């Protein structure tokens, strides 16, 4: 048990839920519910096509919104089964653009509009794809530096980028929002009975995201047969990316293992009542061992 760093609250106002979104489940479901009720989450931008840079021929799609001169570029990375059109991506891009920041919403390999341009698919440790996207940009776009924000699994991808690739770019700061820093613990949590509906929703969307990937016969069979996220990771994600098993994948790509060595100022936000990602994985971190990290564990949100 570690905690510390001022009770993990930093110097931020307390979270106050707005009616009727009380509790972790309603706060998790809010944007999905609003979309089903007809709320539109649209924010047009300039389409960017960025080469993945690994010889695969895969291309990453992004949306760019211009800001005022002299401001750093902000790159947003979506979560599991998300994309540029996810409500949190749209809302953040609109807000930051209104403040004058240029914003790029990056679709990870195989996500959203990138699906038709990629044979491979993203995973929690694929920080090199963020590096490839930045390397493919006009250098002028990075002239004032870059800040990055990753949501959920996108936060895990971002942490791996910061650990292994950030030195190549003028990264000024980073933010993660509810990143699953202990992948094995998150996998166990989502398999719990209370998360049955969430799990069914996620596994169906994950299968749909992988349906257009370049898969062999054995992988196609696995895509039909898997029933849990752990099986999905064990039979599809891990073998396709050289990890072998889900357990190895979780060990190699969990963000917690890279936190002690991060050199970029990074704010890590999480809600203690999140139904998917255990708060105990954040409480287990020795935050005082790295002054570059600022944890914010809110009671809800």
Regions found by a protein language model. Give the residues of each.
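Alpha/beta-hydrolase-fold enzymes
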Residues: 139, 143, 147-241, 247
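Catalytic nucleophile-loop/oxyanion-hole region of alpha/beta-hydrolase
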Residues: 95, 109-147
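N-terminal cap/lid segment of alpha/beta-hydrolase-fold proteins
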Residues: 24-67
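Short beta-strand element of the alpha/beta-hydrolase
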Residues: 71-79
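Catalytic histidine neighborhood in serine/cysteine hydrolases
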Residues: 288-301
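Short beta-strand/loop motif that positions the catalytic acidic residue
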Residues: 262, 268-270, 274
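Conserved alpha/beta-hydrolase
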Residues: 82-85, 93-117
